[in-house]
Amino acid sequence: MIDTKLIVAIVVGVWALLFVVMMSIQKKRKSKATDYRASNADKALLHLYGKKFSIDGRDLSLFETVSGENLEKIVALPEGSHRIAGVYQSTEVSALGQNINLESEKVEFDAELEKGHSYSVAMYAYSPEERREYYKGDVPRDVLSIPLTLVKGSEDVKAYIIVYQDNVGEGEAS
């Protein structure tokens, strides 16, 4: 019969090996994202959270992108107005502590992007004003906010697609 200590030692050994491999993969991903940001400092960096994205009518797979944290996709775009379309996803925690996965239908909008800035486009269960109040004003500047409802034409807003400009320069209002 196999000794219990041997089984525990094997499990711990496999866990340690997998831990080292996953840490190495994570470090390479972070390094790649950092290099991508540095090499595209003269463009607008767009961080997208969701799936099935297209920019200016072209599928996101046609652009050079990198994956960031939390399944974000980072794409560098030239300065100017861009048409962004996609299905946005988010996870919220209910009052009972259960995770609720939110997913929008395809949402399409135009956004004006400036070079040298980083933008996050994501779905939130709260408005930019509610977030600003909660964090006592310590939030990025919201460039665009699109309220989403469960029923078309309803006044009962359930979520927002928000474009935040993450790195507002010194002296600019946030």
What are these regions (language model features)?
Residues 80-84:
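A short tyrosine-centered beta-strand micro-motif
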